[in-house]
A protein has these predicted regions:
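Hydrophobic residues in well-ordered beta-strands that form the structural core
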Residues: 106-107
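N-terminal glycine-/serine-/threonine-rich beta1-alpha1-beta2 phosphate-ribose binding loop
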Residues: 1-102
Length: 107
């Protein structure tokens, strides 16, 4: 997850919490596990706050912070990434994710 702001709170947080508590099923594959394994952001403050507030609602995840947060996250080899940053910050993170060969969803 790249960006933990308003879009995360309104869209992705409820999704991840629901999938964790109720599961996700696809007829073609059976049960599908979708979890946050890492969050990349400038300061990590929102990710840390969410981790503290979500105890038991989702599995824990790593918070990557700083100017190279996306690169730190990509070093963990995620299956896919979602960029939910302000529009003017989509390109750089998205480019790095695609160049790493990771599936990408851009909000």
């Amino acid at each position: 997850m790249v960006g933990m702001g308003m879009i995360f709170d309104e869209t992705y947080r409820p999704f991840f919490e629901t999938v964790h508590s109720q599961g996700l099923y696809d007829r073609r594959f059976g049960d599908v596990d979708v979890t946050i394994v890492g969050a990349a952001s400038k300061t990590g403050q929102r990710a840390d706050r969410y981790l503290a507030q979500s105890a038991g609602k989702i599995p824990g995840f790593r918070s990557f912070r700083g100017d190279d947060a996306v690169d730190q996250m990509l070093a963990e080899k995620p299956t896919f990434a979602c960029v939910a940053t302000p529009d003017d910050r989509h390109f750089e993170a998205s480019k790095a994710i695609l160049e790493a060969g990771v599936h990408l969803l851009v909000e």
